[in-house]
Amino acid sequence: MSVCVTIRTEKKLRPNVYLKHLAENGEHIVVTSDEYPSVKFGTHQKAIRGIEVNKEDYGFEVRVCSFSSTADYQLFAKTVDALMILTGDKAYLEDDDETEITEPLAKFNDEWIEKQHESSFRVTCALINRSGQYIVMYGLFCHFCLGPNLYSGFDISLTGDYERDNANRLLENLCEMQWLCANLEDTHTRMVIPSPTGGVEEGLSVSMICVKDGEVGKFDYISEANLLGIMDMDDEEVAPVFIPFREVWKILPKDVFTPLDELQYLRKGEVTLDMVHEMMERARHLQPNDLHYKPTYPGAGFDEAQHTFILMWNPNISSLSLGDHIWNIANMYAEYFN
């Protein structure tokens, strides 16, 4: 979900023209891509996702995405204003010829920004709650992952109202994460495990921890992918191991790693060879036979791989409490095994 404004013009502006204009008008920006087709930049120390200026046949497209920071939205409005000034041409909302933007700074004001924040949280809460999946979004420097554990950590309910202060704290945390990771090394690779069906989009991306020449490969944080792989390149008899990213927390030494968001982890101490080998052993018990298998979400019906109906329990409307459920399970096992 994003907001897009198109500037219809035949004028050719190099990126440095409007970037310089913004800087001369007091904007302290950091540019991560300074060439078309997509120029990307954000406000120093304040951006989460930054904004994009894309070159199109009809002129320019300025885009800001959901879950952006207040500074991102403000820079979006100022960039639209700058392009209108520099080209002398008209701007339209979402490529709609009937919705002309005449005063972008007034149109995209503080009230509009607040509505964007509220919409971002409402939509992500609903998606996470209904799908049971995490959401990955690209940031100015790195991806960030939203999910139930992250929201719970900031006292943000997936189903009810939430305090705006808690939402602001989460946005501040994501902003700090972007600028922390800007100069850090992650575990990203270009490795993709192809799908048995041959579908390109069904291939699985891999984040990798490696041992080579007696040393653990350098990395500062474990970055999100479909799978985490661990490989000892010094020992050909030890097969590499791959596990779904949702299982990663189960194998990490807690005194060495701390969560960055829902799925990614910052290394805060030394990772030794022994630690990596221990992580590999734990991971082998979690590696699925079929890496491409996706379990059915509770409430979504029959899981063909498990030959099981996966049901959903909502404690908010159930007459059975979690404590009762735990007691019943323990009692059932005690009776069964005795």
Segments the model singles out, each with a brief description of its role:
Residues 20-72, 218, 228-231, 243, ...:
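Short, intrinsically disordered low-complexity segments
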Residues 1-38, 122-163, 281, 288-303, ...:
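Short, extreme N-terminal segment that most often corresponds to the first beta-strand
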Residues 21-29, 79-87, 330-337:
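Hydrophobic, Leu/Ile/Phe/Ala-enriched alpha-helical segments that form helix-helix packing faces
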Residues 27, 34-41, 47-48, 54-163:
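Internal, hydrophobic cores of structured domains that mediate oligomerization or house catalytic pockets
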Residues 189-327, 333-336:
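Extended non-globular C-terminal regions
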Residues 106-249, 254-257:
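Aromatic/basic-lined ligand-recognition segments
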Residues 14, 71-79, 322-325, 329:
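Short amphipathic alpha-helical segments
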